[in-house]
Amino acid sequence: MVTSNTNTQMEVGTIMSVLALCSGTPLEPLPLLYIMASARWAYGADRYLDGKTEDTPESIAAALLTANLILWYTDQSKYIAPEILCILLYPSFKRNLPLLKPFYVGTFWAGAISVVPHLIAHTDVIENETIAMGLLASSVSNIADIEDVEDDIKNGIYTIPARFGINPTRALSAGLFLGSVYKSGVRLPHALPSRHMCRPRFFSSPLSFFRKFPL
């Protein structure tokens, strides 16, 4: 099915930007613009290579150029090659190693959310946050493969849901999500409000009123 995915790409970029802010990326123009451009390039190029989008090569290339110019301007040019190759190598990787496809996606999305934006903003990269984002992206990618099971089987691509079924896929995604929550440092029991009970105080000596009462 061929569709126009500009709105979807904007939604993906927005979600990635929010996740980046949650992982400590400063609220600055360049890191967020890089994330939006990378999402536009990665998602658009993937759909274009699969023949599932009406995007023009020029619009996709413009997004890639924007992301690369930001990397060059902030002295992060060493990430330009991975920015390009991660998408160009993705179709062959998905075909040859389909069971590892969610983790491939998770690795590069973690870099685009929690590593490169931090470097652009000259902020320390937090290891646990990067791992958490990688696990979260892997979980989402794994769930997204459920909708493409029929097409993947027709194309000879046996992803996790195509090989093991829907329920095991959901169980794996749930485990990846819980791992993401754990690595992010969120502790649900401590996040919930606790109840404090007022207990009566007992005195070892009688109150003054009773001390004065004649016995």
Task: List each language-model region with its residue ranges.
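A cytosolic-side transmembrane-helix exit/cap motif
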Residues: 48-56, 98-106, 123-127, 146-157, ...
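Intramembrane alpha-helical segments
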Residues: 35, 43, 53-121
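Solvent-exposed interhelical
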Residues: 35, 39-66, 71-72, 137-180
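Helix-coil boundary and interhelical linker segments in multi-pass alpha-helical membrane proteins
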Residues: 15-34, 68-79, 113-131, 183-191
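Transmembrane alpha-helical segments that form the membrane-embedded catalytic/substrate-channel core
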Residues: 37-49, 83-95, 111, 132-149, ...
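The first (N-terminal) embedded transmembrane alpha-helix
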Residues: 2-19, 106-109
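Functional transmembrane core segments of multi-pass inner-membrane proteins
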Residues: 22, 102-153
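Extended hydrophobic alpha-helices typical of membrane-associated regions
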Residues: 53-60, 168, 186-215
